[in-house]
Design a protein with these regions (language model features):
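Ferredoxin-reductase
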Residues: 2-87
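Cofactor-binding loop segments of dinucleotide-utilizing enzymes, especially the Rossmann-like FAD-
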Residues: 73, 96, 116
């Protein structure tokens, strides 16, 4: 799958908890194909301690809005800076990275999606894609 380096615009940064934010980024053009379970490398500017990009799981892709969401746990300088991003800010990302989940070929009566903490991030997009393919994902939070 081809990789892209994109400058995306922050549309919303929602504080979900003291240590978690939902960062929504939009593109002026259609987003590339992304699979559930893939991730992006997000550049954090403005600090000497954040030289490397941060790997963040793709939480959801809204094709109608050309928007990609990231659930971010604020655990270090880089993720804390991302947690401070404001609507209108530009964020540079490399995506999609990783292989994503192997999707079942035959529709199933029930599939259990399990994740904890920030590990729940890719479950939203995975559940939606499974449902589109005739599966019935079960979730428990």
């Amino acid at each position: 799958m081809k990789k892209y380096i994109l400058d995306l615009t922050v549309t919303e940064n929602v504080r979900l908890h003291a240590n978690y934010v939902l960062l929504k980024l939009t593109s002026p053009s259609p987003l590339p194909d992304m699979l559930p379970g893939q991730f992006a490398e997000i550049r954090v500017d403005g600090s000497p301690t954040t030289f490397l990009r941060r790997p963040i799981s793709i939480n959801y892709v809204d094709r109608q809005r050309n928007e990609v969401w990231f659930l971010i746990q604020l655990i270090g300088d880089g993720t804390r800076q991302l947690g401070e991003a404001k609507a209108g800010d530009t964020v540079n990302v490399v995506l999609p990275l990783g292989n994503g989940y192997t999707m079942p070929q035959k529709p199933s009566d029930k599939l259990l999606l399990v994740g904890g903490g920030v590990g729940t991030a890719p479950m939203l997009y995975l559940g939606e894609q499974l449902a589109k393919n005739g599966h019935k994902p079960v979730s428990y939070t």
